Amino acid sequence: ACYCSLTARILKFDVRLHTKFGSDFPLVDYLIEQKIVFENALSTKQTTQFTLNLVNSERELFLQNKCDPISNITLDADSVIISPLFDEISVELFEKIKNDASFVLLDPQGFLRRVNSENKIYLEQTDLNLSNVSAIKVNQDELKCLTGESNVDGIKILQKKGIDSIILTDKQNISLLSENRIYSITLPNLELNDTTGIGDIFCAAFGCTMLKEKD
């Protein structure tokens, strides 16, 4: 949520952040300084955190803390990025948010994540209602969980569900399906030590550009 919010502020958008964090969260003052508005964010539990193991830019996540869920959201904006981490947004709240906004950009990772007996995070195939979603950002594993397919076949399934723009990320390869055309770019061959936050930054930049340029 912080990565999305800060990126949107850099792009000169007003931001209202709906999230939960505990008393251990160190960036409250910084968010206020950046004029990011948030209310009822303080949780009785510690901030959701993961232990991250990196192997050649591949991530293994282990759940360390789980914050309180978000109980309710009243939107006062036409556009929203929905980007849960782990189990903080219920299906009912997800439906409400979608119906209250005209432009919805979804990063579904938090709806797909599960935890095993060792607290290791894994993804599970999930029947998520994607109606009223304008754009979605997924990686190959998330695409497989949502559609049962990968690559172009999976993207087309999402398109048939009514999503206008589908962004597929695969390490340095990024593809966008929009209006029956697929656009692809390959990022420079850089050594990646930690990719945390890249997806959030990309989502926010894409969403803000769509709102500003309508394209």
Functional labels for PLM-detected ranges:
Residues 14-16, 182, 209-215:
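Phosphate-handling active-site elements
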Residues 8, 139, 199:
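Short, conserved phosphate/pyrophosphate- and ester-handling motifs at nucleotide-, phospho-/glycolipid
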Residues 9-105:
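Conserved N-terminal subdomain of the carbohydrate kinase-like
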Residues 6, 50-52, 174-177:
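Short beta-strand scaffold segments in enzyme catalytic cores
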Residues 1-9:
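Short catalytic helix/loop segments, enriched in acidic residues and glycine
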Residues 112-184:
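Conserved phosphate/ATP/ADP-binding segment of small-molecule kinases
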Residues 192-215:
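Short, small-residue alpha-helix embedded
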Residues 48-51, 113-118, 192-200:
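Short, charged, surface-exposed secondary-structure boundary motifs
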